[in-house]
């Protein structure tokens, strides 16, 4: 049975881990959100989130966005390549309702899966 947990080892925790992804990322983006990715040497993908107060003033809005991102990652983690992912929230993300937001995330994850397969074949 496949475990669909989101344990500590699946998270980017230190500034150095985030910096590694920001240096030379693969990008998939929409006007409201960007997912950056970079290959890691581990046997599993990891996730980091950046949701600035500049874009979402209220804590409960930032928490909603982070919760939806974590849930999306948790459900797709076994389909994703072994990359470190950083989700960057942009202006206008707070206006999206939950079903729209999860649909956008799903499209971006699929784009990263395709990009990873393409980079492996090269």
From Swiss-Prot:
Family of this protein: Belongs to the RnpA family.
Gene Ontology molecular functions: 3'-tRNA processing endoribonuclease activity; ribonuclease P activity; tRNA binding
Reactions catalysed: Endonucleolytic cleavage of RNA, removing 5'-extranucleotides from tRNA precursor
Function comment: RNaseP catalyzes the removal of the 5'-leader sequence from pre-tRNA to produce the mature 5'-terminus. It can also cleave other RNA substrates such as 4.5S RNA. The protein component plays an auxiliary but essential role in vivo by binding to the 5'-leader sequence and broadening the substrate specificity of the ribozyme.
InterPro entries found in the cross-reference section: Ribosomal_Su5_D2-typ_SF, Ribsml_uS5_D2-typ_fold_subgr, RNase_P
Domain of life, source organism: Bacteria
Coiled coil: none
Species this chain originates from: Mannheimia succiniciproducens (strain KCTC 0769BP / MBEL55E)
Keyword vocabulary terms for this entry: Endonuclease, Hydrolase, Nuclease, RNA-binding, tRNA processing
EC numbers, comma separated: 3.1.26.5
Subunit-level organization: Consists of a catalytic RNA component (M1 or rnpB) and a protein subunit.
Enzyme kind, highest EC tier: hydrolase
Protein name: Ribonuclease P protein component
GO cellular component, one term: ribonuclease P complex
NCBIfam families: rnpA (TIGR00188)
One Pfam family it belongs to: Ribonuclease_P
GO biological process terms on file: tRNA 5'-leader removal
């Amino acid at each position: 049975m496949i475990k669909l947990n989101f344990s500590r080892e699946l998270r980017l925790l230190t500034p150095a881990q985030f910096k590694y992804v920001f240096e030379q990322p693969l990008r998939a983006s929409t006007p409201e959100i960007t997912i950056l990715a970079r290959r890691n040497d581990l046997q599993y993908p990891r996730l980091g989130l950046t949701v600035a107060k500049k874009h979402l003033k209220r804590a409960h809005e930032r928490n909603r966005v982070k919760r939806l991102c974590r849930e999306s990652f948790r459900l797709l983690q076994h389909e994703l390549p072994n990359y470190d992912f950083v989700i960057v929230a942009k202006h206008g993300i707070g206006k999206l309702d939950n079903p729209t937001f999860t649909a956008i995330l799903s499209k971006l994850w699929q784009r990263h899966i395709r990009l990873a397969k393409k980079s492996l074949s090269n």
